[in-house]
A protein has these predicted regions:
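Cytosolic juxtamembrane regions of multi-pass inner-membrane proteins
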Residues: 68-112, 120, 124, 161
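Hydrophobic transmembrane alpha-helices and their membrane-interface caps
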Residues: 32-81, 149, 159
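Membrane-proximal cytoplasmic C-terminal regulatory module of class A 7TM GPCRs
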Residues: 160-176
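Alpha-helical transmembrane segments of multi-pass membrane proteins, especially transporters
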Residues: 36, 40, 67-68, 101, ...
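Residue-level signature of transmembrane alpha-helical entry/exit and packing/kink sites
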Residues: 11-15, 32, 36, 63, ...
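Hydrophobic, glycine/alanine-rich multi-pass transmembrane helices and their short helix-loop junctions
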Residues: 18-24, 46-57, 70, 107-165
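Juxtamembrane "pre-transmembrane" interface segments
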Residues: 1-14
Length: 177
């Protein structure tokens, strides 16, 4: 169990490290990185809590479940954040309107993907194999809660972190010069 716990820490550090690096390269903003990463971290903690609640032990077989859930879940955040950033940068929209446009353009696809995938893996709950049933519960949970994090937590973090203000501040200073 100690070896599996150590492996989980290494796996999560590797996954979140890679996501952080790729988000930084893609968006060139620490605010963007936090907007994408924080919901994923929270859902990962919630998944571990669900495992404890349901008595699903942390085993070599269950380690990849969280990695897969994070790997798919990051897509939802990236879909929405990319569109949010695009609408603010190219269309000049304020954050609230940019989020509306991001949801209009990418939200339906993200929700459809999450629901479809959750239903697909959710059917595994009826499997006679306990491992497959456990995976179905955990993956369906992660897919759905990750999309909810991207829809609700990501924009809240964007507002709290002042996304969009980092581009406007230098422009406002130039305008006052």
């Amino acid at each position: 169990n100690e070896a599996v716990e150590h492996a989980e820490i290494q796996m999560l550090a590797s996954i979140f490290g890679a996501i952080t690096l790729l988000c930084w390269i893609t968006f060139r903003s620490w605010r963007a990185v936090l907007c994408v990463i924080v919901p994923l971290v929270i859902v990962t903690i919630m998944c571990n809590a669900l495992m404890a609640l349901l008595g699903i032990g942390l085993k070599v077989a269950t380690l990849p479940v969280i990695a897969l859930g994070v790997g798919v879940g990051v897509d939802y955040g990236i879909y929405i954040y990319e569109r949010l950033q695009h609408e603010m940068t190219h269309a000049g929209l304020p954050l609230r309107e940019a989020f509306y446009e991001a949801m209009r353009q990418r939200g339906t696809a993200a929700v459809f993907t999450a629901v479809t995938m959750s239903i697909g893996v959710g059917t595994w709950v009826f499997s006679a194999l306990k491992f497959q049933a456990d995976m179905g519960i955990l993956l369906a949970f992660m897919f759905l809660v990750n999309v909810l994090g991207a829809i609700f937590l990501l924009p809240a973090l964007a507002v709290w972190l002042g996304v969009g203000s980092e581009e406007k501040a230098p422009q406002q200073e130039l305008a006052h010069s």
